Amino acid sequence: MTPLRLDEGGRELFALHLTPPLGRASGDAVVLCNPFGHEAIRAQRFYRVLGYRLAAAGLHVLRFDYHGSGDSGGEDADFDVHGAVADTVRAATELRRRSGVARLSLLGLRLGAQIAYMAAQALAAERLVLLEPLLDGELYLRQLEAAHQAELDMAFGPRWAREAALRAFNAGRDEALGFALTPRCREQMIAVLREPVRACCRSVLVLSDDAAVAARWGGIDGVRCIASASGVDWTTSDSLNATLVPPAWIELVLRELSPEPAHA
């Protein structure tokens, strides 16, 4: 595993390049695209396990943080969707250069699925894996707001119901579970999820148990939808240190991206 710092025009990204074992490189590479904010923390262990398994199966794997998130440069208020797409394109281009592979795949969870889909079009990616992709930006923002308010309620206890001034102080919509959520980012989340989806890769795998997700993606050439849920509430801090690794997803992704059958 090689840590990387990618700096272009002061927009610094932190990445980890996982390489396949000697003699097992398949000629394939995959970039893992994080979800938004707190959800990226929830998904960290899942991405780590998945990255190691994919590398062991022969793929070059890149995990990275968007500018304004994780260990990359910038403040969290610097994050927005279009910037994250550009970061993904830059990270994937660097992975192609370092690995020398021709076949590139992208994988993303929730908002990361939308980012992966948008970046795949610019990269002419071979394959795309979308894990519980979002459908509606306004609905997603309401869910984030509800989760944020629930966390405040839990943190402040009886004071939350009793003290109107406390609720008013925390009533802004510029934060979600400890991460900045700027008006620009909110607007972009709504706008990009309103755009109709279209064919972009030779093969697209969608994992979600939401029938509306299957309806949105299922009629597109090259798309295969599997009704499979993570079983994880990505927007809560409950059991934050628990093992949030959906085992069925690991096997389905390995089967989709591995050049040969995966072995446990």
Give the predicted meaning of each segment.
Residues 5, 15, 62-63, 256-264:
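Terminal, non-globular segments
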